[in-house]
Amino acid sequence: VALGACSPQPSEKKEPAPAAEGAGDPAASAATDTGADSADADNATAAAEQGLPATEGAQVNEWTSCPYLDSQWVADTNGQRLTTQGIDTRFDPPACVFWSYPDAPQITVIVRHMPSVEEARAVVDWAAPIDSTEPADFEGWTGGRGVFSDSSVYAVQKDDYAVAVWTNQQQTLKAELIAKEAISNLKL
């Protein structure tokens, strides 16, 4: 399955896009969380409505549960205990980031409602570059899946929606199951 909006890529193999920018240590990232008063919430909503670039990674700005994925289900699916989680409210619905014991996130989920089909495809091309991933598709959703040195990615697009999931496991099936659960729970 070819993605029509994917641009030609250099022949060198690329690693997937960063799952959660600056996500490293949840405690260190929490220093930037100011409690999100109503002005912060309004700004986050406005940014989501204005549209972030297709290449925008998740940056946790609120330490709370993911509104569309059950934390125990996520832990069971990825095969790792969940120690903390947070969301990035700049996205609508918010991006979800889950940690286990390592400093890096175990799972990052970004769901994008883009202004156009082409921009949704650009999200998938950024998350799962066509030259370093295999095709992925199900029920009208198309995109890519790939395994890298310390992670895997599953990213798909349908109409003007894109869903990208990164996991620290080297099995795309886990990322795929999480993406499908997010799609189902959000009724996309």
What residue spans do the PLM features occupy?
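Sec-dependent bacterial lipoprotein signal peptides
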Residues: 1-4
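Sequence contexts marking disulfide-bonded cysteines in secreted/extracellular proteins
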Residues: 7, 65-67, 95-97
